[in-house]
Amino acid sequence: MAIVLDGKCLCYHGPLLYEAKVLRVYDEKNQTITSKDYKDVSIDDEKVEFDRPPEHMRQGQCYFVHYQGWKSSWDEWVGLDRIRPYNDENLELKKSLVEKARELKNNGGKKKSGSRPVGRPSKVEKGKKAASRTSNSGSGTNTSASSTSASNPASSSSSGTTAAASSSDKSDRKKATPVLNKRSHPKIHIKVPISLRSVLVDDWENVTKDRKLVQLPSERPIEHILSQFYADTSNSTSSVVEQAQLSEFLQGIKLYFNLSLGKLLLYRLERIQYAELLKAHSEKQYTEIYGIIHLLRLVTLLPEMMESSNVDDQTAKILVKQCDILLEWIAINIARKNFPVDPYINTSSQYEGVALSM
């Protein structure tokens, strides 16, 4: 059975094949798009509103597909490397890929050295614990039990894995960041407003308990948020020095985010999504794709990052002050609904099985 408009197909999303429906077909020779509602419409025709193929896919045949049972936010263009005809042979392949994924999940403890078994917290999960301590001591208040749970995902896992994960966390942290034990300046505290702590707790529960993902690309990416913050904040000071410091601070935030996203800021469930976004938006910086949730994850980890670097005390004080101002500004704008928190989307059981075994 060939791949036809409005017909069934199978598409790779990560390592698995999923049933999908072809909504649009792109003809690379004529640079046109065909759907149920229109035929051979030029890709440059602005009168017709539709999602166009990314630039890097326009040199070949591609299809706009909807994954059966998934929300339309997952609809996307796929090339010939990811799409397969809906036939018995490929259905068998789909089945075998699912079985292999299950085997990998069940034998997680036998994976190659250096991989993280299911149940072990990722670096962002470890970071939530440190971020919670930082925000608590900076604000002088105690968090609720749910906040404690969010800051330490291992505490919500089975009792058999909690102690091992805790011990392993300490060992991993010593190996990864030896400088943390040799601080030459006082411990750095950032004041995280209570409302933002609640956002981070909800974020942890949505991803780790409810198996949801932040909907990406964000409607208000970090680039937009920080540009708005600069516009609002720079107007309140006439000091050239302070404006220069603010600009440098925001450039540093963007740099930190783009460098640390894949290493520090993602839960395991998010890694397939991350790989897909990287492939679909290779021309963009992460700050142009991710939004407020991931920015908050970064800012709450900045104390640890600063402590492990060679930042002098004076610079650290300036950075802490700017972080406090940024977080307060974010809290106010969320409360005023100037920009909402990014929505979450559900994942399929197959996606979860593969993502959590990585």
UniProtKB/Swiss-Prot annotation:
<keyword id="KW-0804">Transcription</keyword>
<comment type="similarity">
    <text>Belongs to the MRG family.</text>
</comment>
<dbReference type="InterPro" id="IPR053820">
    <property type="entry name" value="MSL3_chromo-like"/>
</dbReference>
<protein>
    <recommendedName>
        <fullName>Chromatin modification-related protein EAF3</fullName>
    </recommendedName>
</protein>
<dbReference type="GO" id="GO:0032221">
    <property type="term" value="C:Rpd3S complex"/>
</dbReference>
<dbReference type="Pfam" id="PF05712">
    <property type="entry name" value="MRG"/>
</dbReference>
<comment type="subunit">
    <text>Component of the NuA4 histone acetyltransferase complex.</text>
</comment>
<keyword id="KW-0234">DNA repair</keyword>
<dbReference type="InterPro" id="IPR038217">
    <property type="entry name" value="MRG_C_sf"/>
</dbReference>
<feature type="compositionally biased region" description="Low complexity">
    <location>
        <begin position="132"/>
        <end position="168"/>
    </location>
</feature>
<dbReference type="GO" id="GO:0006325">
    <property type="term" value="P:chromatin organization"/>
</dbReference>
<feature type="domain" description="Tudor-knot">
    <location>
        <begin position="8"/>
        <end position="84"/>
    </location>
</feature>
<dbReference type="GO" id="GO:0006281">
    <property type="term" value="P:DNA repair"/>
</dbReference>
<keyword id="KW-0539">Nucleus</keyword>
<dbReference type="InterPro" id="IPR026541">
    <property type="entry name" value="MRG_dom"/>
</dbReference>
<dbReference type="GO" id="GO:0006355">
    <property type="term" value="P:regulation of DNA-templated transcription"/>
</dbReference>
<dbReference type="Pfam" id="PF22732">
    <property type="entry name" value="MSL3_chromo-like"/>
</dbReference>
<comment type="function">
    <text>Involved in deacetylation of histones, chromatin assembly and chromosome segregation. May act as a transcriptional oscillator, directing histone deacetylases to specific chromosomal domains. Component of the NuA4 histone acetyltransferase complex which is involved in transcriptional activation of selected genes principally by acetylation of nucleosomal histone H4 and H2A. The NuA4 complex is also involved in DNA repair.</text>
</comment>
<feature type="domain" description="MRG">
    <location>
        <begin position="184"/>
        <end position="356"/>
    </location>
</feature>
<feature type="region of interest" description="Disordered">
    <location>
        <begin position="103"/>
        <end position="184"/>
    </location>
</feature>
<dbReference type="GO" id="GO:0035267">
    <property type="term" value="C:NuA4 histone acetyltransferase complex"/>
</dbReference>
<dbReference type="InterPro" id="IPR016197">
    <property type="entry name" value="Chromo-like_dom_sf"/>
</dbReference>
<keyword id="KW-0805">Transcription regulation</keyword>
<keyword id="KW-0156">Chromatin regulator</keyword>
<keyword id="KW-0227">DNA damage</keyword>
<dbReference type="InterPro" id="IPR008676">
    <property type="entry name" value="MRG"/>
</dbReference>
